[in-house]
Amino acid sequence: MARVFVSSVVNGRSDRVWARVRDFNGMPNWHPAIAESRIEGGEPSDKVGCVRDFRLRNGDRIREKLLGLSDYDMFCTYAILESPMGVENYVATLRLTPVTDGERTFAEWTAEFDCPPERETELVANIAGGVFQGGFDALKRAFGG
């Protein structure tokens, strides 16, 4: 099983950063790789079990299911249902933690998935650098860091 871990510090209070990322349908509002998103069946975007169907700027389409969401613990866990990446059993968590020294937020994004062994290095690098770090870089720009 492949594992990805990326972390960063965002120069903004955790409640403000969480307000930006908690909407399971809101990735186009903060992640530069996402062109559009919709929740299937008209479900609320914070209902565990809802499915988002989104399109990347490169045209690829991905479907993901919300597995967990906590405003108290500031995390969102989701699974990929369909993706052109060639991964299986993909589960990821985006978690925010307040930094007590100043108004900053520790952000971490993790994932575990199965893939062909010969593609693991490439997929881990693309997910870590393109998806996770790309999202953190956009958040840092949005919050002045």
Residue ranges and their predicted role:
Residues 80-134:
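Beta-strand/loop substructures that line and gate deep hydrophobic ligand-binding cavities in soluble
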Residues 1-44:
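Hydrophobic ligand-binding cavity/cleft-lining segments
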Residues 29, 38-86, 134, 138-145:
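Glycine-rich portal/gate segments that line the openings of hydrophobic small-molecule binding cavities
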Residues 13, 59, 71-72, 99-102:
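Short strand-connecting beta-turns/loops that link adjacent beta-strands
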Residues 6-8, 62-68, 91-98:
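Hydrophobic/aromatic beta-strand elements that line small-molecule binding cavities or substrate pockets
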Residues 1-3, 73-75, 102-104:
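A generic structural signal for beta-strand entry/edge sites
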Residues 10-12, 56, 115:
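Short beta-strand-to-loop capping motifs
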